[in-house]
């Protein structure tokens, strides 16, 4: 399946294919090993049914998927990603992690989700939004595949609030991280892109507004690490009032 007709999307797809094998290690280094804790909190916010069917948008190597299965035990998760190399690693990991058999992975784009309407109890995404060329369309698709009453949760990185930490973060993320990428992944350009994607991304308030425009309700967000990471939670309204 072609990644996208958008040149930016194709470039991002090729970049993630290049860095797939080192991506998880670099996430740990870049986040000071806090990313797993943030994922657990995202999972807790969305796991509202006993045996839910969850979509992991931009699943990558399966970090969020496997964290959810380990944390919650029950449920089934479908991971969607447009990087073939990432999904190959996810599929391989699924054979050796707890409850890995409750996951499956699909090659495709979150901008053209291949799933039917209102099929998932929840949709989750971690560190994906900044890499999406059309965030409004991405949220529209997430809304479409959610059942009424289902929740959407996303984690992503943002420029932190002003202050001493913001200065340290700017030095670390915009200057040190590309060097770490060059050292560990042998791809400085990829991590230069990731740094720039944070610098130029929407504010958390704007992300919440785009979620609202897509039809979501009960939108909240929570800041971690002085605002360097935010978790947005939103719900597809359920006009009938019947639980999803």
Regions found by a protein language model. Name each.
Residues 1-22, 173, 184:
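N-terminal, positively charged/glycine-rich alpha-helical extensions of SAM-dependent methyltransferases
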Residues 208, 214-244:
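Core SAM-dependent methyltransferase catalytic element
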Residues 23, 123-124:
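Hydrophobic beta-strand segment of the Class I
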Residues 155-210, 214, 220:
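C-terminal alpha-helical "lid/dimerization" subdomain adjacent to the S-adenosyl-L-methionine
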Residues 136-148:
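A short glycine-rich, Lys/Arg-flanked "PGG" loop and its adjoining helix->strand segment in the class I
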Residues 32-51, 67:
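Conserved alpha-helix/loop element of class I SAM-dependent methyltransferases that forms part
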Residues 53-113:
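Class I SAM-dependent methyltransferase SAM/SAH-binding core
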Residues 111-122:
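A short acidic, Gly/Pro-enriched loop at the edge of an enzyme's catalytic core
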């Amino acid at each position: 399946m072609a990644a996208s007709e958008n040149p930016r999307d194709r470039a991002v797809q090729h970049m993630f294919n290049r860095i797939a094998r080192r991506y998880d290690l670099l996430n740990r280094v870049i986040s000071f090993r806090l990313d797993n804790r943030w994922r657990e909190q995202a999972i807790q916010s969305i796991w509202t049914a006993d045996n839910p069917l969850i979509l992991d948008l931009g699943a990558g190597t399966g970090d969020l998927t496997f964290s959810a299965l380990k944390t919650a035990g029950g449920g089934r998760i479908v991971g969607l990603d447009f990087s073939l190399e990432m999904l190959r690693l996810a599929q391989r990991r699924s054979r050796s992690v707890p409850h890995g058999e409750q996951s499956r992975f699909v090659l495709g784009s979150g901008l053209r989700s291949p799933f039917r309407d209102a099929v998932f109890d929840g949709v989750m995404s971690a560190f994906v939004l900044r890499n999406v060329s059309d965030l409004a369309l991405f949220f529209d698709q997430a809304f479409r595949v959610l059942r009424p009453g289902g929740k959407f949760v996303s984690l992503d990185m943002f420029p932190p609030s002003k202050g001493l930490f913001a200065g340290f973060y700017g030095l670390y993320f915009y200057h040190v991280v590309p060097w770490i990428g060059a050292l560990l992944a042998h791809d400085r350009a990829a991590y230069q892109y990731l740094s720039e994607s944070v610098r130029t991304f929407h504010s958390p308030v704007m992300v919440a507004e785009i979620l609202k425009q897509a039809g979501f309700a009960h939108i909240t967000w929570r800041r971690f690490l002085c605002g360097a990471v935010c978790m947005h939670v939103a719900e597809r309204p359920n006009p009938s009032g019947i639980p999803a």
